[in-house]
Amino acid sequence: MSVQKEEYDIVEKAQLSVSAESLTSDSESISHNPFDDFHKAERWRKVYESSGYEGLSKFDPEFTWTKDEEKKLVRKMDLKIFLWVFIMFAFLDLIRKNIARAVSDNFIVDLKMNTNDYNLGQTVYLVIFLASELPGNLLSKRFGPERVIPVQIVLWSVICITQAGLKNRGQFIATRCLLGMVQGGFIPDNILYLSYYYTGAELTFRLSFFWCAIPLFQILGSLLASGIIEMRGIHNLAGWQYLFIIEGFLSLSVGVASFYLMRRGPTQTGESAFHKGKSLFTEYEEKIMVNRILRDDPSKGDMSNRQPVTFKEILYTLTEFDLWPLFIQGITAFISLQTVGSYLSLILKSLNYSTFLSNILAIPGQALLLINLPLAALLSRKLKEKSLCVGIANVWVLPFIVSLVALPTDTNPWIKYILLTGILGLPYTHSILAGWVSEISNSVRSRTVGTALYNMSAQVGAIIASNMYRNDDKPYYTRGNKILLGFTCFNICMAVATKFYYISRNKYKDRKWNSMTKEEQINYLDTTKDKGMKRLDYRFIH
């Protein structure tokens, strides 16, 4: 075997390790080029050819561009790609959370239900949402997010509007089931869609703004609801009925526009679901997009954006046990936030606040969340630290939960409100976890399935949260708060344990790799059937 070949493979190993262990800056792809070696570039070219990768014609290992050109391009992508994804996600959250505002207007009483019936409806929604996550994501991978996502938005908007006609418990549960079915898969669809355009570090940071839509539109939703609900009595309709109708039609307009505004991919930005037109980017910009993405993660070209994921590949991803610590945190990390967020209006009503105040008083907590969410992501990015930054959320929540448990039931309602607001305003690190899963997946297949499985784990947490406060525990939910305290302590320990787990996995791989001779290392790189994060030359970021 030639010296050149040996040098190439050893360099490849080093480059893969470096790329896996560090969070790159937005412009690092300019200086870091894993395709500098001709043999490695040709190996990857063959991978891209066999996969039918749509960006192959733009792949150029020798292509160069300036930092200013890349920064300008990223800003343009933010405006033309990310902004609309943000808007679509905002309306997902507006529609799926408007039920929490509807209950402040006697929704439960009007349908002759109780808290447990409401819990059941929320649980059904979340279970169906969870079950639809992976199928929805696989449909998007097969037919394209620019087609599937707009259809989802239109369907959930129609269902939202029909909720204005609800009369009883059975109809309520049926519409929650339908809503969960059409909304499932939307979030991992969009994460995968954004991964076509952004590097790993860029994606994680932008996902923090992606999830800023939650507090931002909860604030807007609360303001909107406080006004709409005052329409109760007009044409003999309840305020919550007007809420579903108005917000449903607003969402419907976004769904229709999405058919025209979502694009097929970086080299196909002239193609939407309904037409082919002028590309959003120049040929030169498309070439930068393709090469910067592949240099950040060469595996992003190992599947085309229409290539389906097989059942065998799904099972393979399920055996990627190194993703499981992140899935576990996806389940438990935000149960406190999800519980308090779902029940805040009911809790405030039970504390004798008016319907109007119950909606308005939700705003400070959401505003605090809106501030803390990007700050947590920025801290993670600056420190190049994921595990411990994820743990910050529950360190923040701990004193508020302890106080809720310790204070007597006759404590001033305003003090309880402040504690609940503190929980709602936690540094929401969901974006760090979601981006982390995408970043360490190390293949399009694992990324497609892994992001869906992570979001499914988050829905399991939401199911737990929707049943945390029970009818026999109100109005103070003392038992529920004690359970939340237990979850909070577990989450802090889990964040630290995850870091040590990945450190130990990297040390194990180092020992295995360093025990090989150079010839054995070269042979491994040429012949191994290990994929993704199971490869010995792959290192975990933590």
UniProtKB/Swiss-Prot annotation:
Cellular compartments per GO CC: cell periphery; fungal-type vacuole; membrane
Sequence intervals crossing the membrane: 79-99, 120-140, 148-168, 177-197, 209-229, 242-262, 327-347, 360-380, 388-408, 417-437, 483-503
Pfam family, one: MFS_1
Topology in the lipid bilayer: Multi-pass membrane protein
InterPro entries, per the entry: MFS, MFS_dom, MFS_trans_sf
Keyword terms, alphabetized: Membrane, Transmembrane, Transmembrane helix, Transport
Any single biological process term in GO: sulfate transmembrane transport
Matches recorded under Gene3D superfamilies: MFS general substrate transporter like domains (1.20.1250.20)
Superkingdom of source: Eukaryota
Main location: membrane
Protein name, per record: Uncharacterized transporter YIL166C
Organism: Saccharomyces cerevisiae (strain ATCC 204508 / S288c) (Baker's yeast)
Phylogenetic classification of the source organism: Eukaryota, Fungi, Dikarya, Ascomycota, Saccharomycotina
